[in-house]
Amino acid sequence: MYKLVLNHFLQEKNLNEVYVTPKILSEIDAIDCTSYLKMPMVKKAIIEVFSKNSFLEKMKLHREHKLYITGIKSQVGLCVQMGHKAGFYFDLYKLAYLADHGLINKAIIILPSKNLEKFCNTSSIASYELISKQMLLFKKTKNYKMHLMCLDIKRRT
């Protein structure tokens, strides 16, 4: 049996600012995973945890367009990205739009680890390891505070 772990690399103060509580972390840790796991299953489970903890699901960017981010709580945007790199970069544009319109000032972006990518037997996704390196190029282009978080999988002990 395996479990999901959200690695955040943030101090407790910063976690509180983006509403990632110890309860959310323990609920993610409690998700049981078998040897068969696909990225859509992982994404659904993570969204469910955040939704149960007061994040509103599917934040629509504009009433005339069918564009969404995963969720929002107060002025913190949430994107759970378990897909291709292009989807991640499109999420950045959507978050920037929300920030430009005063709807968010911070964002959490959850990305799978290379380890989780391998476990799910997939490839060419926006892994935390890849994206965190690439984002060093864009430090000064964001109009909101972004926190990348790494979703990993470990054997349950």
Which ranges hold each PLM region?
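Acidic-basic catalytic patches of nuclease active cores, encompassing PD-(D/E)XK
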Residues: M1-R63
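Active-site metal-binding core of divalent-cation-utilizing nuclease and nuclease-like domains
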Residues: S35-S74, H84-Y93, Y97-D100, R155-R156
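Hydrophobic anchor at the start of a short beta-strand
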Residues: E57, N105, M146
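Short beta-strand-loop-alpha-helix junction that forms the active-site gateway
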Residues: G77-F90, K114-L116, C120
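Arginine/glycine-rich "motif VI" loop of SF2 helicases in the C-terminal RecA-like domain
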Residues: L98-I104, L137-K142
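Conserved beta-strand signature within the Rossmann-like core of class I S-adenosyl-L-methionine
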Residues: L103-S113
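Domain-level recognition of nuclease-like catalytic cores that cleave nucleotide substrates
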Residues: K114-T157
